From Swiss-Prot:
Its main location: membrane. Its EC number is 4.1.1.98. This is 3-octaprenyl-4-hydroxybenzoate carboxy-lyase. GO terms for cellular component: cytosol; plasma membrane. One of its GO terms (biological process) is ubiquinone biosynthetic process. It is found in: Cell membrane. It holds the Pfam family UbiD_N. The keyword Manganese applies. The gene is ubiD. It comes from the Bacteria. Mn(2+) binds at residues 172, 238. Homohexamer.
């Protein structure tokens, strides 16, 4: 099923029983977080708060609170079907050279489909139906959530931040949280390696002292939102990928105050600039780790214009100790990652990011081991192949007979197949999430790999244990008599 815009997605979710309207007054200050958190932990529906306290604008929460809704947002009916999305991305990331003319013709439709999904620029759009500029810009008109008691203030969480550096044609689109500090000012928390921060750095080098144009789209269609958090190859734009998911080209419209292009169907768009040198202390905020993060300096985004649809809907979320919405997104996107990894490492059988590991900090890999030291090669591959795993601190590698998604199985393998000195790999001074306060230096820490595979000659001189397995004939006989046993 495909969706034109966020409102179409809301309508379809409601028809499926996957969205509930909340008609009573609920405060965006803390109350929405508690309601969304309880609902998410119960596997409940997306929530449309129709009467946010002190506001007339509805708030959409818990939109991607189950893996199924993530799959639906990607145009699929099940989480399992996301493997096909991953296979497409794996092919586009590293296409196999055709072995002949016949095979070349077979791959041609795939490339044609991608080319046909290039975004379409339109002259007018619903996201610019209403325009507020100058003194009329007031973020207090938007019911921005304050999520936790110790938060520094209201926090915009689902904004798609659009930037463009001076050295490339393509725009960057990323999701960076924004602390509201005034009627027209928010703190843009982007880490130094992220696309928006790199664009800003390059801009400051080429145009020192000049304001840097930025736009933030709130409430885009689900394919565009999910395109911004999916491991899209550098050769494919997020908008083209969203078009593939949606089955139609992404429509973009030029901002009123800059040349940046934003999703035409977005509910709200914030337009403005970042003045070089204008920074402010950001935080603390409760984060996906389950802790409040440190305070640090980040650029301030000055909003010069707010455009929106008529009767806009504000899309929001919260982050907290897993499971939260980012953790659920991780569970679903896990299925997209697997084919991409398998394309590079065919020996990988399964790959699992447990949600309790804060979405990406711990990975379990099962593999078909082929030679001594093979598990260590896979560890290094996980850390280096996709930038999404740059911050993965722990990688556990096991054999294919272990279920990566069953902790009892994984712990059994670790405690029976590992020697701590021989089978751990420690790497120091590697990139680590800025929010990881356990690292000795902000943004720099260590990683550890656990080789929980059966050891081959060359890795051990001892006779290796043989797993206990019941005789199949005995199992069949017991199956036949089971119901007579009264158990």
């Amino acid at each position: 099923m495909k969706y034109r815009d966020l409102r179409d997605f809301i309508a379809q979710l409601e028809a499926l029983g996957e969205l509930k309207r909340i008609g009573v007054e609920v405060d965006p200050h803390l109350e929405m977080t508690e309601i969304c958190d309880r609902t998410l932990r119960a596997g409940g529906p997306a929530l449309l708060f129709e009467k946010p306290k002190g506001h007339t604008m509805p708030v959409l929460g818990n939109l991607f609170g189950t893996p199924r809704r993530v799959a639906l947002g990607m145009g699929e009916d099940s989480v399992e079907a996301l493997r096909e999305v991953g296979k497409l991305l794996a092919f586009l990331k590293e296409p196999d050279p055709p072995k002949g003319l016949k095979e070349a013709w077979k791959t041609l439709p795939i490339f044609k489909k991608v080319l046909d999904m290039a975004p379409k620029k339109v002259g007018s759009a619903s996201c610019q139906d209403l325009v507020r500029e100058g003194a009329d810009v007031d973020l207090s008109s938007i019911p921005v959530q304050t999520c936790w008691p110790g938060d520094a203030g209201p926090l915009i969480t689902w904004g798609l931040v659009v930037t463009k550096g001076p050295h490339k044609e393509r725009q960057n689109m990323g999701i960076y949280r924004q602390q509201v500090i005034g009627p027209n000012r928010v703190i843009m928390r982007w880490l130094s390696h992220r696309g928006g921060a790199l664009d800003f750095r390059d801009w400051c080098e080429k145009y020192p002292g000049e304001p840097f144009p930025v736009a933030v789209a709130l409430g885009a269609d689900p394919a565009t939102i999910l395109g911004a958090v999916t491991p899209v190859p550098d050769s494919l734009s997020e908008h083209a990928f969203a078009g593939l998911l949606r089955g139609s080209r992404t429509e973009l419209v030029k901002c009123l105050g800059s040349d940046l292009l934003v999703p035409a169907s977005a509910e709200i768009v914030l337009e403005g600039v970042i003045h070089p040198g204008d920074t402010a202390p950001e935080g603390p905020f409760g984060d996906h780790t389950g802790y409040y993060n440190e305070v640090d300096q980040f650029p301030v985004f000055t909003i010069e214009r707010i455009t929106s649809r008529r009767d806009p809907i504000y899309h929001s979320t919260y982050t907290g100790r897993p499971p939260d919405e980012p953790a659920i997104l991780g569970v679903a996107l896990n299925e997209v990652f697997i084919p991409i990894l398998q394309k590079q490492f065919p020996e990988i059988v399964d790959f699992y990011l447990p949600p309790e590991g804060c979405s990406y900090r711990l990975a379990v890999v099962t593999m078909r081991k082929q030679y001594p030291g093979h598990a260590k090669r896979v560890m290094m591959g996980v850390w280096s192949f996709l930038r999404q795993f740059m911050y993965t601190k722990f990688v556990i590698v096991t054999d294919a007979d272990v279920n990566a998604r069953d902790w009892q199985d994984v712990i059994w393998a670790m405690t029976t197949r590992m020697d701590p000195a021989r089978d751990t790999v420690m790497i120091e001074n590697t990139p680590i999430d800025y929010l990881d306060f356990a690292s000795p230096v902000s943004g720099l820490g260590s990683k550890i790999g656990f080789d929980a595979t059966n050891k081959w000659p060359g890795e051990t001189t001892r006779e290796w244990g043989t797993p206990i397995v019941m005789d199949e004939a005995v199992k069949r006989r017991v199956d036949e008599m089971w119901e007579t046993l009264g158990l």
